[in-house]
Regions:
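Conserved phosphate-binding catalytic cores of ATP/NTP-utilizing and phosphoryl-transfer enzymes
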Residues: 1-25, 30-37, 41, 125-128
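Conserved phosphate-binding/catalytic loops in two-lobed NTP-binding clefts
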Residues: 3, 154-173
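Short glycine/serine/threonine-rich phosphate/pyrophosphate-binding segments
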Residues: 8, 26-32, 41, 52, ...
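Acidic-glycine-rich active-site phosphate/pyrophosphate-binding loop
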Residues: 25-35, 86-96, 143-158
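Glycine-rich phosphate-binding loop plus the immediately following alpha-helix
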Residues: 36-79, 168-171
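Adenine-nucleotide phosphate-binding core of ATP-dependent small-molecule kinases
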Residues: 93-122
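Glycine-rich phosphate-binding loops at beta-strand->alpha-helix junctions
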Residues: 115, 128-156, 167-168
């Protein structure tokens, strides 16, 4: 409860009429719905890291890259590969298949960024379509320091969201 309220206080500081907080960290993610100035609903994913920052970091390291460079090259992707939003085991095989087919690292990195967001939106939050996330969205958690993940969310939503410069610290606000 205390952490959830910290996330809400932090989001409200950056966007007073926030309606949705999407927090993706290294190991878990949460979505808080705000209604009439109070936390109305909380959705959590703590069982699987396939939609979290550690998932991306592991892939970057497997290619001998740090996560910053891995994210940066994703922004230059021409054709992000569709890797779905399944568990890490399935994702590993899809990435290997893409590599065998000559897909660029940039397109794989961008595809993984989309996978993180699709996992959050469609598996954890269980939206029918991305636009159902809400109109006034604040993103939090260290995963959103990754510009490719942020951009994937904004492209799927069709609009910008608010990412505070202290996104990874919002749970302690």
């Amino acid at each position: 409860e205390v952490e959830t309220m910290a996330h809400y206080r932090g989001a409200k500081h950056f966007l007073p009429d926030v309606t949705t907080i999407l927090d993706i960290g290294g190991q878990d993610m949460k979505c808080c719905r705000i209604k009439d100035g109070a936390v109305d609903d909380i959705l959590l994913n703590e069982a699987c890291s396939s939609g979290c920052g550690s998932f991306l970091d592991t892939f970057a390291r497997s290619l001998g890259m740090d996560i910053g460079h891995f994210a940066k090259i994703a922004l230059s992707a021409k054709h992000p590969v569709d890797l779905g939003s399944r568990c890490t085991v399935f994702m590993n095989s899809r990435v290997r298949e893409a590599q065998k087919n000559g897909v660029s690292v940039a397109d794989i990195s961008a595809g993984l960024s989309y996978s993180v967001i699709k996992n959050a939106l469609y598996k954890v939050i269980r939206l029918k379509k991305a636009s159902d996330l809400g109109e006034r969205v604040v993103v939090q958690g260290g995963t959103f320091y990754n510009d490719a993940v942020l951009r994937a969310l904004e492209l799927l939503l069709g609009r910008e969201v608010i990412r505070p410069d202290v996104a990874g610290l919002m749970g302690a606000y």
